[in-house]
Amino acid sequence: TIVAYHGTDRMDFDSFDIAEARIFNVGLHFGTRAAAQSRIAYLHGENPSANCRILTCELTLQNPLRVDDIFGHSYARIFEVLEDEIGRARTPAAPFRRKYDELLRRWMNADDNPRFAKNPSLYFAFNQKLNEELRHLFQKLGYDGFVYTNELEDGESAADSYCVFDDRQVAVVGEEMVKYGRCRARCAA
């Protein structure tokens, strides 16, 4: 069991639901207390009155894939990791390769699709489906999440953060209510 933290501005949940994860996430993200504080600061910019929570969670990860900090980047980095793992797979790679090629083609065409420009909710639905399919491909390869050195939110004191693929891997064991202003001051310290 790994103890990690999650910063959120949502007050309406006490357990995680992968189906409701923010649209551009392949899984649910957890890290150090500093990373959770940094995430809250990112969500709220200069809004010092925002109520936020830092959740203390226990994660159950059996076989996470170690990756670079790819989560502040485009899908291209996730596809590169997937392609590398398909190449290493001990199972026949052809079914994974076909699915990978299909997902990559759909993703590459998404930005040029005029339907998405006219209907952002359609684009969000597309991305949610893409994330779901990417998550399932990594699960079929035997992984239940990612572990990565969080350079974006932990800064110079970069530490491991985690991305889990199934909400049943997460138990919320505590929470701390914070005002963004207090969180920001602690984060800068």
Please tell me what each predicted stretch does.
Residues 1-189:
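Active-site and NAD+-binding cores of ADP-ribose-processing enzymes
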